[in-house]
From Swiss-Prot:
Subcellular location: Nucleus
The UniProt record lists the keyword Transcription: yes
Subunit structure as annotated in this protein's UniProt entry: Component of the Mediator complex, which includes at least MED4, MED6, MED14, MED17, MED18, MED20, MED21, MED23, MED24, MED27, MED30 and MED31.
Gene3D superfamilies recorded: Mediator complex, subunit Med6 (3.10.450.580)
Organism: Drosophila melanogaster (Fruit fly)
UniProt name for this protein: Mediator of RNA polymerase II transcription subunit 6
Alphabetized UniProt keyword annotations: Activator, Nucleus, Transcription, Transcription regulation
Length: 249
């Protein structure tokens, strides 16, 4: 389990050395890979022993244990290095492969990681396809299940759900029936205690108009006044004497 976790961590790593990137060649690529700062390089391998003893790479075939070899070259960009365990000069078991592209070292994924990644992508795509297909399925009691691929159907369902959410939010923000009635009662009480002033123009409009004969009389009087002008009313003196009383014979 720990080795599997370490392998997955190495798949996310990359390494490069800017000092030697420009001078890579089939003769120098192994020295570039075997630098101590490379996290993919195991310092307990046979390559390190050969380097410390200043021997040539051909001596690796006569040794037993872990070693790194140059497997494939595609100059000047790609180099493939294999990590393997040598049992004898003619037999070795591959452990891992590393590739160098443009001076950057990566670990190549093994077959299990490739299969797991492909299966995961397939499952995710199938799940999204089933979810998309289920959104077009419709059920009717008489017809059963049918497909409805009208483009507006899904959008209309989404708009309806959005409207329902908006209405529910409005209902939550509005007050209860008791609160509304209570506010109306308080407003009516305040209006009764503090009535607003009525303008004079509205007071004249509120006076009842003259009824029937009084209205006609008022109209005739106004017409006569307009036609003849103002009338002079003569008044008699207040000192007039009453007629003498008749005496009985």
């Amino acid at each position: 389990m720990a080795s599997r976790q370490m392998t997955n961590d190495h798949l996310r790593l990359s390494w490069h050395d800017t000092q030697m990137m420009a001078t890579l060649s089939p003769q120098t690529v192994m020295d570039y890979f075997c630098r101590k700062s490379n996290p993919f390089y195991d310092h307990m391998c046979n390559n390190e022993t050969v380097r410390m003893q200043r021997l040539g790479p051909e001596h690796l075939h006569n040794m037993i244990g872990l070693e790194y070899i140059l497997l494939h070259v595609a100059e000047p960009i790609l180099y493939v290095i294999r990590k393997q365990h040598r049992h004898n000069p003619s037999e070795a078991t591959p452990i891992a492969d590393y590739y160098i592209i443009g001076g950057t070292v990566y670990k190549a994924p093994d077959l299990a990681n490739v299969i797991n990644s492909r299966i995961l992508n397939t499952v995710v795509n199938l799940q999204s396809a089933f979810e998309e297909a289920s959104s077009y399925a419709r059920y009717h009691p008489n017809k059963g299940y049918t497909w409805d691929f009208s483009s507006n159907k899904v959008f209309s369902d989404r708009s309806k759900s959005d409207k329902k959410d908006a209405n529910s939010a409005k209902d939550e923000n509005s007050g209860t029936l008791f609160q509304k009635q209570r506010v109306d009662m308080l407003l009516a009480e305040l209006l009764r205690k503090f009535p607003p002033p009525i303008p004079p123009m509205l007071q004249n409009l509120q006076q009842p108009p003259p009824a029937g004969d009084d209205l006609n009389t008022a109209r005739n009087a106004s017409e006569m006044n307009n036609a003849t002008g103002p009338l002079d009313i003569k008044t008699e003196g207040v000192d007039m004497k009453p007629p003498p009383e008749k005496k009985s014979k």
